[in-house]
Amino acid sequence: MKPSCYDNVGKAVKRKCETTIAQKRDISLMDTGANTYLIRPNYKDKFKAGVAKECIGEILREQLYGVQYDPEEVPTLSRSLADSIKHKLKDMAFDRYKFIVQVVIGEQRGEGVKMAARCFWDADTDNYAQEIYMNDSLFCVAAAFAVYYY
């Protein structure tokens, strides 16, 4: 198979290429938001686990008060809680942080539950907050992991 720069006879074909620029922009002067060279957050922008814990607890109390455990509703409720927590944390303006939210809901039957999480992260910038909610019917453990985006 011949390359596309040859015609059917085998002769080289010259191709003319023209480009036009419809809009000129100076990319170096564009406002891109956060500085790309920041590798550590300022103290005021750092993730505050205590504030996040209060936020998570408030959401759990509001949305789980009076709720009875129903295994059919738990998957939807878990996703709804995780989304609510994630959006509330994003609204708190922790700049350049990515959030991972995990919600576990189980039936309250007087049995013990052990949960653990392990992470490989930067101890100077990354952190987490968790909160536990319990009533007569269910327990809920919500954890939010905040990872600084370099």
Curated annotation (Swiss-Prot):
It is found in: Dynein axonemal particle. Disruption phenotype: Morpholino knockdown of the protein produces a dose dependent typical ciliopathy phenotype, with ventrally curved body axis, hydrocephalus, abnormal otoliths and small eyes. The few embryos surviving to 4 days post fertilization display severe generalized edema, pronephric cysts, and defects of the craniofacial cartilage. GO terms for cellular component: cilium; cytoplasm; cytoplasmic dynein complex; dynein axonemal particle. Its main location: other. Keywords: Cytoplasm. Acts as one of several non-catalytic accessory components of the cytoplasmic dynein 2 complex (dynein-2 complex), a motor protein complex that drives the movement of cargos along microtubules within cilia and flagella in concert with the intraflagellar transport (IFT) system. Required for proper retrograde ciliary transport. This is Dynein light chain Tctex-type protein 2B.
